[in-house]
Amino acid sequence: MLMPKRTKHRKMFRGRMKGAAHKGNFVAFGDYGLQALEPSWITNRQIESCRVAINRTFKREGKTYIRIFPDKPITARPAGVRMGKGKGNVEGWVSVVRPGRILFEVSGVTEEKAAAALRKAAMKLPIRCKVVKREEKENGGEN
């Protein structure tokens, strides 16, 4: 499972997901990518499930790039505990994903195989996603 080795603070505010992704919204490493269309928290278990689904489709060919990392701790109180008495213990880790963010990238496989693998990965996520292709930029921008 993905999680930070160490953090500056143990617990974090929930925050809010406003607007679209400002960074990480272009295919940078691979040839095809999976782009988020909705805002959500993606857990480390969901990321791992997508990684396994993609790699099983490829059968040891091609390369997978994970473009998100779960760096936000999520706390929860035990069941049957009354309100108050402080913030709960860290239960898991999530990555905050905004619309437009590239979640996974793949390279070294055909377009059909890449699209099939990324669609399988999208089924494991709680948000709508679309498969995007790398586009070359003339102006020297990102990729």
UniProtKB/Swiss-Prot annotation:
GO cellular component, one term: cytosolic large ribosomal subunit
Biological processes per GO annotation: translation
CDD domains on file: Ribosomal_L16_L10e (cd01433)
InterPro entries linked to this entry: Ribosomal_uL16 (IPR047873), Ribosomal_uL16_bact-type (IPR000114), Ribosomal_uL16_CS (IPR020798), Ribosomal_uL16_dom (IPR016180), Ribosomal_uL16_sf (IPR036920)
Keyword annotations: Ribonucleoprotein, Ribosomal protein, RNA-binding, rRNA-binding, tRNA-binding
GO MF annotation: an example: tRNA binding
Pfam families: Ribosomal_L16
Domain of life: Bacteria
Quaternary structure note: Part of the 50S ribosomal subunit.
Sequence similarity: Belongs to the universal ribosomal protein uL16 family.
Role this protein plays: Binds 23S rRNA and is also seen to make contacts with the A and possibly P site tRNAs.
Protein name, entry field: Large ribosomal subunit protein uL16
